[in-house]
Amino acid sequence: MRKPGNSTSNGAALAPAGRLLLHLAPGLRQAIDPDDIFFVEATGDDTRVRTRAARALRDVRPLGEIEPLLLRRGFLRTHRNYLVNARHIRQVRRRPAGEDWELKLDPPVNRVLPVSRGAVAALWAAFGED
């Protein structure tokens, strides 16, 4: 019998205490606290998960399969290839070329990631701006 709160509507498993199970390889799972994730990047058929410890973990699932698990935990889809933990966004700025936007993440990651034009409104809304 399934315990309440241990799976999502799409059947993906949640680890205890709100942790996320990364699928590192077939038959190998690792629990991680979503707050420790800075961003998730699509890399072909799988996904790269960048953590607070500045490690990159590989999840064998595509980004679209992980997305619903993270959107309800404060992550934003900022680009077709990226989900970003809003709690780790340090700065949002226009790109030097003009119209497009980018964001910079907190240390120790300090990565600069693109923000697609279609994601700008949702980004401002997440921070309570118009």
Model-derived features with residue positions:
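Mature exported/compartmentalized surface modules and terminal targeting/interaction regions
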Residues: 2-3, 124-130
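Conserved binding/recognition cores within well-folded domains
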Residues: 2-112
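Structured alpha-helical
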Residues: 118
